[in-house]
């Protein structure tokens, strides 16, 4: 991947992701906080891959593609999407603090997503299903000079 650096010491790193049409993951670092955006990813076995674990290591938030349920995934293998369970496994391996599941299947209604979020929170208390219009804020932490 590539890295963009900005005068205010913000950095954006990229990582190619496994997807039939190609995709890119992003790691945003600024003022001691890290957020990673991992969309359009076909998870592989073994999971999670070492390069992705390094990429999201110690992130404050990982925003992850949770298009399918574990039950749906075998029928949709090769479509370039993943499951919330794989997002949890990635976050655990990388010591990420929170997980937002997005890129949701259009056939999954609000009731389904609420039920899934209950399972998600049971697996990782700081995880949630992202919602339209939702905004999150992180306070800056002291950075080394």
PLM-predicted stretches and their roles:
Residues 44-133:
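Cap/insert and terminal regions of metallo-dependent hydrolase folds
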Residues 1-50, 54-55, 134-145:
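Core dinuclear metal-dependent hydrolase active-site scaffold
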């Amino acid at each position: 991947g590539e890295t963009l650096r900005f005068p205010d010491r913000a950095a954006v790193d990229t990582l190619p992701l496994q997807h039939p049409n190609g995709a890119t993951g992003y790691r945003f670092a600024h003022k001691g906080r890290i957020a990673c955006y991992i969309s359009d990813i076909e998870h592989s076995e073994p999971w999670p891959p070492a390069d992705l674990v390094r990429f999201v290591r110690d992130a404050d938030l990982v925003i992850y593609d949770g298009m399918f349920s574990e039950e749906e995934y075998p029928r949709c293998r090769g479509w370039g999407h993943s499951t919330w369970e794989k997002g949890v496994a990635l976050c655990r391996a990388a010591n990420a603090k929170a997980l937002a599941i997005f890129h949701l299947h259009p056939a999954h209604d609000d009731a389904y997503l609420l039920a899934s979020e209950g399972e998600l929170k049971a697996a990782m208390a700081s995880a949630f299903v992202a919602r339209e219009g939702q905004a999150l804020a992180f306070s800056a932490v002291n950075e080394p000079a």
